[in-house]
Amino acid sequence: MKHRTLLTCMCGLILFGSCKDQPTQNEQPLEVMTFNIRLDAPSDSANNWKYRKDNVCKMIAYYQPDLLGMQEVCHNQMEDLKLGLPQYTALGVGRDDGKEAGEYCPVFFKTDRFTLVEHGNFSLSEQPETIGVRGWDASYNRITTWAI
């Protein structure tokens, strides 16, 4: 009896948990993408940023994400991405000084779909409000960019 009750409850949870609301006409899917573009390292020779930047922008334009998070973005790459992706608002700062030094972890969003309410950055360390601080045995400073 105990097993039958448990089985009935589990079947009910599975049945009702798998139900899906019907989408309304106003609903739009949210396309999200993350992309580690690799920093601009002169030692990359044939894979140098100057050879990759157009293809990076083309790939993003092809997938057209509404929200885009990136990693390993240097300041010059951030400037190139802003120029190559004019339909996006770009947010982020360098991890070493909170301005331009060090890699960025920027957030890009489609300007025509979202309205920026608030944004900021914090360090992944024991002192999150101080940019440029290493934490928890990290080899490099780590930073996060957020937006509402």
Question: What residue ranges belong to the model's regions?
Answer:
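Short alpha-helical segments used as structural interaction elements across diverse proteins
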Residues: 1, 49-50, 139
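Bacterial N-terminal signal peptides that target proteins for export
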Residues: 1-7
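Repetitive helical segments and hydrophobic/amphipathic motifs
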Residues: 11-13
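N-terminal, active-site-proximal structural segment of metallo-dependent hydrolase catalytic domains
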Residues: 6, 16-84, 95-103, 121
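Structured beta-strand-rich core segments of catalytic domains in phosphoester-bond hydrolases
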Residues: 67-148
